[in-house]
Amino acid sequence: MSPLRYQKWLRLNEVRRQMLNEHYDVTTAAYAVGYESYPISVGNIRGCLESHPREILPG
């Protein structure tokens, strides 16, 4: 894994953690870790974490 891909992976896992533990919606979590665009963050979540943000949140 390249350094850039690893950095993206860390950022996306922080988005996931904030959604699960802090009960942030995907937009708030994405902006909190530095994403500036909702479509880009959703696309990265889908590509790197292999799930849509709706699938991350419980119930």
UniProtKB/Swiss-Prot annotation:
DNA-binding feature ranges: 26-49
PROSITE patterns assigned: HTH_ARAC_FAMILY_2
Annotated ranges, domain HTH araC/xylS-type: 1-59
Example GO molecular function: DNA-binding transcription factor activity
Keywords: DNA-binding, Transcription, Transcription regulation
Protein name as it appears in the record: Putative HTH-type transcriptional regulator YneL
Name of encoding gene: yneL
UniProt key word DNA-binding: yes
InterPro entries referenced in this protein's UniProt entry, alphabetically: HTH_AraC
